[in-house]
Regions:
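Catalytic machinery of carbohydrate-active enzymes
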Residues: 1-324
């Protein structure tokens, strides 16, 4: 039995790699799959995913993992210099000047217009190309959503307190990565959008999503079909909540990738440079994208009118669908 280590940090970035993790376990069920990560705070969630055998949290002492194959989706020259000094068995990385010198890399390598989940799968293929090509079509990635831990304690209480509606659409306006680079709408814009949608579609429940650890909390007057859901730090709780949704309107952030796995239809406000890499739709669900270049704020009012129309069109489609 080999020890295959897959290394990826972050929350959303790690969720994008679930295809690769699931593929490794399906292709090599007798081997032990170890996830090495840093930044996904809910380790209990990861420990209860059946296709991951072991979790290592941190960015040091990789040699203690005793890997036979060490796969990393991190592409960084200083990190590669560190890896080169370690005894990790066979190392598979994304192409880079240093990785081409020291490690195994997927070649030929074309990633233009590929979703990051597909790029991560290239690393899995590099383990054994023939075995991968022969058996990859047998993997049903839509099954991943049924393997995620789920805890409906919070969501069950929330939905019991509210009237039943024909459809449920969540709006997620916060995202750490997008806020760091200034690529997000103003909070007031999001709140105005949620109010406008709730007035135009009274038969749909609109939910503003927030988290207990967020320093910014909503202070709005809730209506019958406009509510606020505040999740705990539990990702299993977020899974249960998202499973109740018929649609998601969100800035590009981790919940987008979770709803991608769950195949929830989504409308994503996303930077143009990540249009292909980090959006939804990679598991077969429907994803609409509203992408803009940096500097879009110069024409903010006009662009917001276009986004509002897009959100209305998305909501109309969700309303008219008999099943999602």
């Amino acid at each position: 039995m080999r020890r295959i280590v897959f290394h990826q940090n972050g929350f959303g970035d790690l969720l994008v790699c679930f295809k690769a993790l699931y593929a490794i376990k399906c292709l090599y069920p007798k081997d032990k799959l170890v996830l090495a990560q840093k930044g996904f705070s809910d380790e209990n969630f990861l420990e209860n995913i059946p296709f991951i055998d072991e979790i290592y949290t941190g960015d040091k002492n990789f040699e203690n993992l005793k890997s036979d194959i060490f796969i990393t989706n991190i592409r960084n020259s200083s990190f590669f210099k560190t890896l080169h000094k370690l005894k990790l068995g066979r190392i598979i990385t994304q192409p880079h000047l240093l990785s081409l010198l020291y490690f195994d890399t997927p070649m030929p390598y074309k990633r233009a217009k590929l979703h990051m989940s597909e790029i991560a799968l290239k690393l899995v293929r590099a383990i054994d190309k023939r075995h991968y090509d022969t058996n990859f079509s047998k993997i049903n990635f839509k099954e991943v959503k049924n393997l995620l831990p789920s805890d409906d304690t919070l969501s069950e209480k929330f939905f019991k307190q509210n009237k039943q509606f024909s459809k449920i659409i969540a709006l997620n306006i916060f995202g750490n990565q997008t806020e760091n680079i200034g690529f997000n709408l103003l909070p007031k814009t999001w709140l105005d959008l949620s109010k406008n949608l709730s007035e135009k579609f009274p038969e749909i429940l609109f939910i503003l999503v927030n988290f207990t650890h967020n320093t910014l909390q909503f202070n709005i007057k809730e209506k019958e079909n406009l509510k606020v859901f505040v999740n705990s730090d539990s990702i299993a709780s977020l899974v249960a909540f998202c499973n109740r949704l018929d649609g998601l309107i969100s800035v590009d952030t981790g919940i987008v990738h979770l709803c991608d796995i769950l195949q929830i239809p989504s409308l994503i406000f996303i930077p143009k440079h990540t249009f292909y890499r980090f959006s939804g739709g990679s598991y077969g669900g429907k994803c609409e994208k509203f992408s803009l270049e940096n500097g879009y704020q110069k024409n903010y009012a006009k662009i917001m009118q276009i986004f509002y129309k897009k959100a209305n069109h998305f909501t109309t489609r969700i309303k008219n669908e008999n099943s999602i």
